Amino acid sequence: MLWVMGSSARNPYVIATRALDGDAEHGGLLFRINCAGCHGIAGQGLVGPSLRGVSSRLSDPQIIHQVVSGETPPMPRFDVEPQEMADLLAHLKSFTADT
């Protein structure tokens, strides 16, 4: 995966990801394997911040950038194909502020 500097909304990876239909169920599996250790199984936050309501705080391009960039340690860079990122994004959108 190549992350191109500049506006994340114009990034080819972001464009490819957003063009896909995400599978929230598969995204949940990816989340449990890769993210829940720090963000909690329900996105409530542990070592990492709460992800409840994240899609109301950040745009899709911002969320994608946050996940794949590795620019905010201690969160590692998550190197996934656009379909997997679309799936994860669909799952993250299920975390409403009151879940």
Predicted regions and their residues:
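Electrostatic cytochrome c docking/interface patches
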Residues: M5-L30, T99
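Non-ligating segments of multi-cofactor redox enzymes
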Residues: M1-W3
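Extracytoplasmic electron-transfer domains, predominantly the class I c-type cytochrome c fold
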Residues: A42, L46, R52-T99
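Sequence/structural segment immediately N-terminal to covalent heme-attachment motifs in c-type
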Residues: L20-I41, H65-S69
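Short linear motifs at secondary-structure transitions and domain/linker junctions
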Residues: P12, E25-L29, P49-V54, I64
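Short hydrophobic/aromatic-rich motifs at helix boundaries and adjacent loops
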Residues: G6-S7, I33-G37, D60-P61
